[in-house]
Regions:
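Acidic-and-aromatic substrate-binding clefts and catalytic sites of carbohydrate-active enzymes
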Residues: 40-52, 68-81, 108, 148-152, ...
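Short, acidic/polar
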Residues: 44-56, 122-131, 197-209, 265-270
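Bacterial N-terminal signal peptides
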Residues: 15-27
C-alpha cells in the first residue's frame, strides 16, 4: 500500500509540474493555424513539459494519458492527473482538445480479462461516464480506435458482432453519446487513405453509425503515407467525403530520415490533406526528436533546430 501511495504521489507531482510549467510559460505565440478555419495540432506526452508546443500547434491530443489502461491501471483506482494537466492546458490556451480514446484493443486494462461479461460491460460504461463527468467540455473523442485491426478482448460483453456485424461499436458510441453529449464523436482508424479493403470496411461501420446519428466525424490516421500515391490519397479522401461527415486527419507522421526527402513528401502530401473540403483539421503524431513514435518522423531536432520540412510547413501555413 505504501509503495502504491508513493507511486501515485510522484505521478501527481510530475503532472502538477507539467501543468504549472505550461501555464506559466510565455503567453504570446503564433501557432501555424492561428486564425484559420482548421486546426493544426499535435500530441502531448504523459508528464513531460513541452514549452515549444504552443509555438507551432493549436490542438491537443494526449498521446497516452487518455487511454483507459493509463487512467485505470488498477480496477477502481483512477489516475486522472496526466489527463487533467493536458485538458487544463488546452482550455487555458483556447486550444481544441481531443480525447484519445475510449475503446481500443491495445492498452486496455489487463484486469478486464478476468471479469465476467456483465462486469466488463459495467466497467466500460463507468469508464466512459466518469470521463464525461470530469471533462464535459471536450470537443472531440476517439470513441473507438482501430476497430478493424485491434478489437477489445471484451467486445462480446458490449454486444459482439450482433446483427449488424458491429454491435459492440454501436454500444460504445451510444454510451459516449449519452455521457458526453457536448462532444463530437469520432471513429479513428488507420490505412484508410491507402484505399482498398480497409477503406471499404471502415465506410461500412461509419454508415451503420451515421444511420443511428451516433457519429460526428471520421478520424483518419496518417501513418504509413510515405509511399502511398497522391492519387490514391485524393481518391480515398473523396470516397470518405461522400459520406458527408467532417474528416479529421488524426495521426500524421512521415517517417523519413533524409531531410530533403521528408520535406519533398510534406510538400506533396500536406496540401492534399489541408485543402480537401471535407478535412476540418490535421493532427500530427509527435514532432520532437527522441520523443516520437516513429523515430525519423520528427520535425524539431534535439538541439531545437527545425528540419527543412518544418521550415517549409511554417512558410506554407503563413499564407
Amino acid at each position: 500500500m505504501n509503495r502504491e501511495l508513493t507511486r501515485r504521489h510522484i505521478e501527481c507531482q510530475r503532472s502538477l509540474f507539467f501543468l504549472i510549467f505550461l501555464l506559466l510559460g510565455p503567453s504570446l505565440y503564433a501557432q501555424m493555424a492561428q486564425g484559420k478555419a482548421k486546426f493544426l495540432g499535435n500530441i502531448l506526452g504523459n508528464s513531460q513539459p513541452d514549452p515549444d508546443f504552443a509555438t507551432y500547434w493549436n490542438q491537443v491530443t494526449p498521446e497516452n494519458s487518455g487511454k483507459w489502461a493509463s487512467v485505470e491501471p488498477t480496477r477502481g483506482l483512477m489516475e486522472w492527473s496526466g489527463l487533467d494537466a493536458m485538458y487544463q492546458y488546452a482550455r487555458s490556451r483556447g486550444f481544441v482538445f481531443k480525447q484519445h480514446n475510449f475503446i481500443w484493443g491495445r492498452q486496455q486494462p489487463s484486469w478486464m480479462d478476468s471479469l465476467p461479461p456483465d462486469q466488463q460491460k459495467l466497467e466500460a460504461k463507468k469508464w466512459i461516464s466518469q470521463y464525461g463527468q470530469r471533462y464535459p467540455d471536450t470537443q472531440f473523442i476517439d470513441v473507438v480506435n482501430e476497430p478493424l485491426h485491434n478489437q477489445p478482448s471484451y467486445k462480446k460483453a458490449l454486444g459482439g458482432d450482433g446483427s449488424t456485424g458491429w454491435d459492440w461499436v454501436i454500444w460504445a458510441f451510444s454510451t459516449a453519446r449519452r455521457y458526453c453529449p457536448h462532444s463530437k464523436l469520432l471513429l479513428n482508424e488507420y490505412n484508410m487513405l491507402a484505399g482498398g479493403k480497409d477503406l471499404e470496411q471502415a465506410i461500412t461501420i461509419i454508415k451503420i453509425l451515421k444511420r443511428r446519428n451516433l457519429i460526428d466525424g471520421i478520424g483518419v490516421q496518417g501513418h504509413g503515407l510515405e509511399n502511398v500515391s497522391d492519387a490514391t490519397i485524393r481518391s480515398s479522401l473523396n470516397r470518405l467525403g461522400s459520406l458527408r461527415l467532417p474528416i479529421y486527419i488524426s495521426e500524421l507522421d512521415l517517417n523519413i530520415a533524409d531531410d530533403d526527402s521528408q520535406q519533398k513528401r510534406y510538400k506533396s502530401l500536406f496540401p492534399i490533406l489541408w485543402h480537401h473540403s471535407a478535412v476540418k483539421g490535421v493532427t500530427l503524431w509527435g514532432y520532437k526528436q527522441n520523443h516520437i513514435w516513429k523515430s525519423n518522423a520528427y520535425l524539431l531536432r534535439a538541439d531545437g533546430s527545425e528540419r527543412p520540412a518544418l521550415v517549409w510547413l511554417k512558410e506554407y501555413m503563413s499564407h
